[in-house]
UniProtKB/Swiss-Prot annotation:
PROSITE patterns: RECA_2 (PS50162). GO terms for biological process: DNA recombination; DNA repair. Keywords: ATP-binding, DNA damage, DNA recombination, DNA-binding, Nucleotide-binding. The lineage of its organism: Archaea, Methanobacteriati, Methanobacteriota, Thermococci, Thermococcales. InterPro entries: AAA+_ATPase, DNA_recomb/repair_Rad51_C, DNA_repair_and_recomb_RadB, P-loop_NTPase, RecA_ATP-bd. The gene is radB. The keyword Nucleotide-binding applies. Involved in DNA repair and in homologous recombination. May regulate the cleavage reactions of the branch-structured DNA. Has a very weak ATPase activity that is not stimulated by DNA. Binds DNA but does not promote DNA strands exchange. It comes from the Archaea. Belongs to the eukaryotic RecA-like protein family. RadB subfamily. It holds the Pfam family Rad51. GO terms for molecular function: ATP binding; ATP hydrolysis activity; ATP-dependent DNA damage sensor activity; damaged DNA binding. The keyword DNA-binding applies. This is DNA repair and recombination protein RadB. ATP binds at G32, P33, F34, A35, T36, G37, K38, T39.
Length: 225
């Protein structure tokens, strides 16, 4: 019997890293550089699990064509896959706030997942330092996760920190305080990525797995890969 409190990622290694899958009732932050598979990850979790998906697309990164490709490659009904996703496209930080607030009334028992991709795009584009606004939006998402019993994935961008010489997540402390589970994606080589578990409610931090990006979406990397 499937554990309905966990959503599979479709990647055995990622599911094991996360203690069985993406948990309902909490916020999972996924961050990393461009083209490391963050959006594909969020889409795949929505595709492979029962329930509708509220997908807040702030960057125009959600691709119906890509979702259709993933569904078709897995022999899933493409039309049903597309119908599962309810897309919102806020054009600035204020619209993002309004959309997230509306989700409190929109998300019901038919939904299993909420995605904000990416959570910090407008914040970054507007050169904002309003950490309080992001914190308020995260509080709403926390409420939705708990009260509506859905999983919430917030995709985050990175910036180069000249002091430490490493890439860090935007609004690191604000998101770090509100997100219980944190995954970092990194590029290894063409098509192959690494997922690092930076924090988890009960899993040891620092664990990592390899995965690859294919027509199906994200897949486990086998030894011969």
């Amino acid at each position: 019997m499937l554990n309905t409190e966990l959503l599979t990622t479709g990647v055995k290694g990622l599911d094991e890293l996360l203690g069985g899958g993406v948990a309902k009732g909490v916020i999972l932050q996924v961050y990393g550089p461009f083209a490391t598979g963050k959006t594909t990850f969020a889409m795949q979790v929505g595709l492979l699990n029962e329930g509708k998906v509220a997908y807040v697309d702030t960057e125009g990164g959600f691709s119906p064509e890509r979702l259709a490709q993933m569904a078709e490659s897995r022999n899933l009904d493409v039309e049903k896959a597309l119908e599962k996703f309810v897309i919102f496209e806020p054009m600035d930080l204020n619209e993002q706030r309004q959309v997230i607030a509306r989700l409190k009334n929109i998300v019901n028992e038919k939904f299993s997942l909420v995605v904000v991709d990416s959570f910090t795009a407008h914040y970054r584009a507007e050169g904002s330092r309003e950490y309080g606004e992001l914190s308020k939006q995260l509080q709403v998402l926390q409420w939705i996760a708990r009260r509506k019993n859905v999983a919430v994935i917030v995709v985050n961008q990175v910036y180069y920190d000249s002091n430490s010489g490493i890439l860090k997540p935007i609004a690191e402390h604000t998101l770090g305080y509100k997100t219980k589970d944190i995954l970092r994606f990194e590029r290894l080589r063409v098509g192959v990525r690494i997922a690092v578990l930076e924090r988890h409610r009960f899993r040891p931090e620092g664990g990592m797995v390899y995965f690859k990006i294919t027509d199906k979406g994200l897949e486990d990397v086998k030894n011969e890969d």
